[in-house]
């Protein structure tokens, strides 16, 4: 560690003493933390102690209060005690705080490692990256200051938690919180902490479904409109066409991806006791601070931020002009933000979203899909994996707990991703393979015989170049024969629930462009499905998204107005190696 020359001998001695004791600076961190990165954050720029500050409370004191049921006293201590970022107290404090929310019986010693062995077949940490569950947001797997080993540990924890808690279907914040926990404790302790947070019934800590996630950010938006009215009005004034939704969808990343680590750690001290309402309060303070800076700092002038306020907010958080203590003080000084008030808005927002599950566009009624709310049941996973040729799963099939599980994981990611895109009601049914070119031949006639009466159907294409893509088709293929009042067959049929997807090499879903209820769409944006004796096509309007010939051998893919998709394979033209079509039993 560099130090300054000059000064008196005692000053130099103090500095040298600091060098000798440098290792003590890191005693609060777990072994899988890159401490050299953290050194530059806070240690040598701490505010000088005036001697008037009360002594920081100890773990034992807090433990006694918690055992006595004095949660309010604990809350006040956590809010007011600014333990340094490297304080060893968190290694004991955080597990205790998270553990109080555990509703299940206390985990037996070794339970986590038994789960690891059941899922991976070994407790050794793999040197190769492992595929994360579908509920993880791959763009926000924030490691903070974890080493590569620490990141692998975080990956493993999240996988085991996903296996143990199959009800978790969408939880983008779970990975970052896992990473934060691992800075101060062991792998097993971090897992137990997460299990406590996820299993909490009294307070909400981590959203676990797409619906909860959406209700939460909309709740934050509603609260902000009241408690940070000046800020939200300012954003709309400088960007007249701006929808506030675009800003608040990323509200949690202002905190988890934007704030400096020392701020984040102090927020977690309170969050692990009080729940997600702490993050609500911090988000409101960030908005107010940003608004003030916009009016006084040229860096955040309207011209500089109006094109991307969301990104500007993240950048502002990285340079936030207040200390962790001041940030928390401001957050907990907001009046009228009780738990009851927040719950009232949350429930109202949730009911509103559920009531809008049926969208109306013109004369058509569509079921809006909360696509990530459900993943496959264990049996439906077995069924589709054992049947599928396109995903090349059958020859590697294995269940969790067998040695083959790791081999199937690369292919199972496709299954989980695809299943998460289906309308929620469809995921309740078991898939059945209706048609595959490998068993039923390459004939459009056979395709119709086996498929046309089923609704909906899922088409998956694997090309000779190994691209994998397809479509969810909401209507029966038999509708190609339905005639209008004039006795003419309709060229296109289907509904806006139809969507395209690509699984390899790109992974993406392309829903109907009108799914958000835009009433100004033209006819060319409502061309979902078409078929005759010579071809089938999905998606039209200035191009066909998927077109296949009568021999189901050759096809082409273009951009189209109905789905606003790019070509689903780079060349545009493709030769079909396998076509599979699935229906769903019991619909």
Curated annotation (Swiss-Prot):
Domain of life of the organism in this record? Answer: Eukaryota
User: Is Membrane among the key words of this record?
Assistant: yes
In its UniProt record, a GO molecular function of this protein is: GTPase activator activity
Q: Cross-referenced Gene3D superfamilies, in alphabetical order?
A: Ypt/Rab-GAP domain of gyp1p, domain 3
The residues the record assigns to binding a 1,2-diacyl-sn-glycero-3-phospho-(1D-myo-inositol) are: 75, 79, 277, 281, 335-339
What role does this protein play? GTPase-activating protein (GAP) for Rab35 which regulates synaptic vesicle (SV) protein recycling and turnover at the neuromuscular junction boutons and possibly ventral nerve cord via endosomal trafficking. Inhibits Rab35-mediated endosomal sorting which traffics old or dysfunctional SV proteins through a degradative endolysosomal route that involves the ESCRT pathway and the HOPS complex members dor, vps39 and rab7.
Q: Which protein, by its recorded name, is this? A: GTPase-activating protein skywalker
- Phylogenetic lineage: Eukaryota, Metazoa, Ecdysozoa, Arthropoda, Hexapoda
């Amino acid at each position: 560690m560099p130090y300054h020359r000059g000064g008196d001998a005692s000053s130099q001695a103090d500095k040298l003493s600091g060098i000798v004791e440098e290792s003590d600076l890191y005693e609060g961190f777990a072994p899988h933390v890159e401490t050299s990165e953290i050194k530059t954050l806070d240690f040598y720029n701490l505010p000088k102690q005036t001697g008037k500050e009360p002594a920081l409370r100890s773990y034992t004191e807090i433990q006694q209060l918690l055992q006595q049921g004095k949660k309010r006293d604990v809350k006040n201590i956590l809010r007011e005690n600014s333990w340094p970022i490297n304080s060893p107290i968190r290694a004991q404090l955080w597990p205790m705080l998270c553990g109080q929310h555990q509703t299940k019986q206390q985990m037996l010693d070794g339970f986590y490692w038994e789960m690891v062995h059941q899922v991976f077949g070994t407790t050794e940490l793999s040197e190769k990256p492992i595929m994360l569950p579908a509920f993880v947001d791959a763009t926000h797997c924030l490691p903070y200051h974890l080493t590569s080993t620490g990141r692998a540990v975080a990956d493993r924890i999240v996988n085991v938690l996903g296996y143990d808690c199959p009800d978790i279907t969408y939880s983008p914040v779970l990975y970052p919180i896992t990473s934060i926990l691992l800075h101060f404790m062991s792998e097993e302790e971090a897992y137990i902490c997460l299990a406590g947070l996820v299993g909490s019934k009294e307070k909400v800590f981590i959203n676990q479904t797409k619906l909860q996630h959406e209700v939460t950010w909309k709740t934050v938006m509603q609260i902000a409109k009241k408690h940070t009215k000046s800020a939200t009005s300012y954003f709309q004034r400088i960007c007249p066409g701006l929808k506030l939704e675009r800003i608040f969808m990323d509200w949690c990343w202002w905190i988890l991806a934007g704030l400096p680590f020392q701020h984040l750690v102090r927020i977690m001290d309170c969050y692990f006791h009080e729940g997600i309402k702490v993050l609500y309060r911090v988000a409101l303070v960030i908005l107010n601070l940003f608004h003030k800076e916009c009016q006084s700092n040229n860096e955040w002038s309207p011209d500089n931020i109006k094109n991307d306020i969301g990104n500007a907010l993240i950048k502002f958080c990285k340079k936030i002009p207040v200390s962790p203590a001041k940030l928390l003080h401001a957050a907990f000084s907001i009046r009228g933000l009780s738990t009851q008030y927040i719950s009232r808005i949350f429930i109202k927002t949730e009911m509103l979203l559920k009531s809008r599950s049926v969208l109306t566009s013109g004369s058509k009624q569509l079921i809006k899909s909360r696509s990530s709310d459900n993943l496959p049941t264990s049996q439906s996973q077995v069924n589709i994996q054992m049947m599928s040729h396109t995903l090349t799963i059958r020859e590697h099939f294995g269940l969790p707990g067998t040695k083959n599980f790791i081999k199937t994981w690369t292919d199972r990611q496709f299954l989980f991703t695809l299943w998460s895109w289906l309308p929620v009601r469809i995921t309740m049914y078991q898939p059945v393979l209706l048609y595959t070119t490998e068993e039923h031949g390459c004939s459009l006639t056979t395709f119709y015989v086996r498929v046309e009466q089923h609704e909906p159907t899922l088409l998956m294409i694997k090309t000779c170049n190994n691209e994998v893509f397809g479509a969810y088709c909401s209507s029966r293929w038999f509708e190609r024969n339905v005639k209008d009042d004039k006795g003419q067959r309709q060229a296109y049929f289907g509904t806006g629930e139809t969507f395209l997807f690509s699984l390899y090499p790109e992974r993406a879903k392309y829903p109907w462009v009108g799914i958000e209820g835009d009433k100004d769409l033209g006819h060319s944006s409502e061309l979902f499905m078409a078929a005759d004796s010579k071809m089938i096509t999905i998606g039209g309007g200035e191009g066909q998204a998927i077109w296949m010939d009568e021999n189901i051998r050759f096809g082409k893919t273009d951009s189209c107005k109905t789905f606003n998709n790019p070509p689903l394979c780079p060349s545009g033209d493709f030769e079909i190696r396998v076509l599979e079509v699935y229906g769903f039993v019991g619909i």
